[in-house]
Amino acid sequence: MSIGVQSSGINISHAELSRLVDAGKSEQGDKAVRDGGRALARADAALAAVVGERVAARRDAVAGSGAQRVELARPKPDAQTRATDRRTVSGLEREHKRLAASQTPRVTGMHDALVQRHVSLDGAKAAHGEGVKRAAGDAPRAAADAPQRFAFADDKAFDAMLALGAAMQKNVQSDLAMQGKLTMLAHDAMMSAAAQDRSIGAAQMTAAIAGGALQATTSLGGAMQQMKSLSTKSMSIEKELKPQAELKQFHAEQALELRGINKPVLSNDEVSHVKIKRDTGETVRHEIDHGGERMSDEHASVLAQEAPARQHRIDMHGMRHEENLVKAGRQQMKGDLLQSGGQIGKNQIDGASAQQQGADRAEQKEDENAQQTAMAAASTRDEAAHRSREAAQKAIDAAKSQVANDNAVAAQVAGNLRT
């Protein structure tokens, strides 16, 4: 197989074409898109150099023989196509301004390959001029070190696509940073909500411990006061009521003596006296009338004198007992007040704890809302990035189509050279 240019008599064999293509391949082969593009560019440059060298030699020979020299004009893209491309890229750029940058490394890698392979109009023209000058005598070096640019990449729409890719690469880091900030914000809000949960639990535990301790203390104090009240009543019964009862009994017996009831009488052995023990412990002896019908006047007088004193002592025992009851009542009241105060204090602690828990729950709600907002923003950001990736893919497809069109133009140039 060979490629021939009929008007110039140039024939390039298949082996030579393979050698030229192999000379422009990268050491890494076609493992990556960028390396494959570079290999293709070098092969095209080498082919153009060889063709240019032989065409130049043939042209010089023809010029020496006096033949007419024919110059081929560079093909120009259709104006309508260029306008359509510009409108397409303009729309992509406007869409890109509303969307986030792409996060897919594969997409950014393809943009790298496109940017490195193609340049703007001025760079393309300069590269083309240099290629024409070096075509005659520098073919081997051009095959190895040819710039990775295309002379036909002079469409402004195509340059706009490349600029779009470069701008998207710059925005990748900002998009990732924003995603990280939103994620950290959601994480911080979640941690704050968890801290508020722990704070609410701690407040409940503190209120329970403090209220329980206060109520236990006041209940114990109230119980002690109630025990004192019962002890006072018991002491009053023992020291006041019992002596009072004994005095009342003795007083009644003495009253019966004064009325002549159950008065002592002489027995068969004719005892002439009787001994009476007073409440003071003193024993008094009274003489008994031998007639046995009545007490002596002295005996009756003594009993009559002691009756008011006994009645006074009985009344004083009753008064002291009443005082003891009043004292016991005060102690009972203190105990009740202590217990009631403990319950009131516990209620106050519960109220303060409930207020603190309410404030913590309000902060927890705010943190949860902040977390939900951050998650919603992150989701929106991710959706925008997804739409941006789709737009970037469309831009790449458009760039590929432009490259295919430019390759078709190059093929047309080669066809014109053959004819």
UniProtKB/Swiss-Prot annotation:
Give me the stretches of Basic and acidic residues compositional bias: 71-94, 380-392
Write down the superkingdom of origin: Bacteria
Ribonucleoprotein as a keyword? no
Record region (Disordered): 62-94, 338-402
Spell out the InterPro entries in the cross-references. BipC/SctB
Q: Name one GO cellular component term.
A: extracellular region
Q: Which Pfam families match?
A: IpaC_SipC
Instruction: State the compartments where it is located.
Output: Secreted
Q: Which UniProt keywords apply?
A: Secreted, Virulence
Chain ranges passing through the membrane: none
Similarity-based family: Belongs to the SctB/SipC family.
The name under which this protein is listed is Effector protein BipC
